[in-house]
């Protein structure tokens, strides 16, 4: 099967705040595909142009980019125009999932549980937000990943600095109710009715601080896969993950992040349509739990590469 993929581009690097993580993901995917006999080539979208991409002769591409210009629908739209099959979700699902505000609105429309939130701008009276959402609360830029720009606000006096940090990345800032509980994540593979959740992972970071450093570079963070949950709770979390994935129109693969509260109720936090594929990443961990190696996972994702926008039949 590997030879049938033809010449494959592994798109990595890019220009987002998550470039460093993407470089690690891309190199890992590239090595795995080579080991599986795939004619794979690295392509850094932060250093090369779309014209270079069009001229490279790739028959399909594996998107190992994270954040803006790689995970937000812009690249996916360009690949649709170029007619190059690609991994993961299409332009619309990628755009919706990258925007944490729109993600939450879609989930609420589908009756899915997500913490209460407000959208903050320059005219917002910051001192009133904790009265509505409670303390502590979370402030984050809606278009960044890997915990970039996120602050857990403990008191009224922290609001201004937290807002200014998040506003460095976005014109709007997402304020979100803080739910005390266990941090979980669920990988989903496939599309449509065939999409299935992999085993639930629990993340336990030192001091409960699962930040950029603990995500990608620390050996102190603990991961439990499958998570130690009652069978009915694990099944409920997996079902909510599949519904959340479907509600946004995701395809191919993705990862859904949760908080499980003290009553074992899952609360949806974020959708990742191009999750990390580093040595510390969670989708490969979940795949291993069902007997799928890192290389097998990469090949399975690549096998589903496609253009997602369906052109209407021409009327001549």
UniProtKB/Swiss-Prot annotation:
Keyword ATP-binding: yes
GO biological process, alphabetically ordered: cell wall organization; peptidoglycan biosynthetic process; regulation of cell shape
Positions annotated to bind Mg(2+) 1: 257, 270
EC number(s) stated in the UniProt entry for this protein: 6.3.2.4
Domain of life: Bacteria
Pathway where it operates: Cell wall biogenesis; peptidoglycan biosynthesis
Root EC class: ligase
Binding site for Mg(2+) 2: 270, 272
Pfam families hit by this protein: Dala_Dala_lig_C, Dala_Dala_lig_N
Cofactor(s) demanded: Mg(2+); Mn(2+)
PROSITE patterns associated with the record: ATP_GRASP, DALA_DALA_LIGASE_1, DALA_DALA_LIGASE_2
Residues holding ATP: 130-185
Entry keyword Ribonucleoprotein: no
Catalytic activity: 2 D-alanine + ATP = D-alanyl-D-alanine + ADP + phosphate + H(+)
Compartment(s) of residence: Cytoplasm
Family annotation (Gene3D superfamilies): 3.40.50.20, ATP-grasp fold, A domain, ATP-grasp fold, B domain
Cited function: Cell wall formation.
Family: Belongs to the D-alanine--D-alanine ligase family.
Protein name, entry field: D-alanine--D-alanine ligase
Organism of origin: Bordetella parapertussis (strain 12822 / ATCC BAA-587 / NCTC 13253)
Lineage, broadest ranks: Bacteria, Pseudomonadati, Pseudomonadota, Betaproteobacteria, Burkholderiales
Record gene name: ddl
